[in-house]
């Protein structure tokens, strides 16, 4: 089983950027927790973080065709990343959109996701554990 984890712009700054909003856990810590759980389940986890939409699209085009699941936190690309949305739409794997904060309790511009219409589901506001919940769902979905 192959799971892709995609982290969009500014997520490399987790732990330093607005910890009152995003928490104090770093991206490396999130990826380590996901990798530990995936390995225990016999799954392969491939991760990427980029501040550039094109790099995320290149990753999806290279790795997404045979992926069994995709976890994506598009960051600000959530609201305007149409090329990223189109790259996700090409793939057959279930997609879980994750947001650390509850975007619906924040500024109005954050309430719209161009990714949501192509995602299987969305988890928002549960902090870094939202990634783990997404992974658990994907692992269970493939066992069903």
Curated annotation (Swiss-Prot):
Q: Which reaction does it catalyse?
A: 3-dehydroquinate = 3-dehydroshikimate + H2O
Alphabetically sorted, this entry's keywords are: Amino-acid biosynthesis, Aromatic amino acid biosynthesis, Lyase
Q: What does this protein do?
A: Catalyzes a trans-dehydration via an enolate intermediate.
The UniProt entry, under CDD domains, shows: DHQase_II
The first-level EC class reads lyase
Q: Which GO terms describe its biological process?
A: amino acid biosynthetic process; aromatic amino acid family biosynthetic process; chorismate biosynthetic process; quinate catabolic process
Q: Which Pfam families does the protein's record reference?
A: DHquinase_II
Gene name linked to the record: aroQ
The name of this protein is 3-dehydroquinate dehydratase
Residues annotated as site: Transition state stabilizer: 17
Top-rank taxon, per record: Bacteria
In the record, the note on similarity to other proteins reads:
Belongs to the type-II 3-dehydroquinase family.
Look up and give the organism this protein is from. Answer: Roseiflexus sp. (strain RS-1)
**Can you tell me which residues bind substrate?**
73, 79, 86, 100-101, 110
Asked if Amino-acid biosynthesis is a keyword of the record, the answer is yes
Task: Specify the pathway.
Answer: Metabolic intermediate biosynthesis; chorismate biosynthesis; chorismate from D-erythrose 4-phosphate and phosphoenolpyruvate: step 3/7
UniProt keyword Amino-acid biosynthesis present: yes
Subunit details for this protein?
Homododecamer.
Please give the HAMAP family that the UniProt record associates with this protein: AroQ
The UniProt record lists the EC number as 4.2.1.10
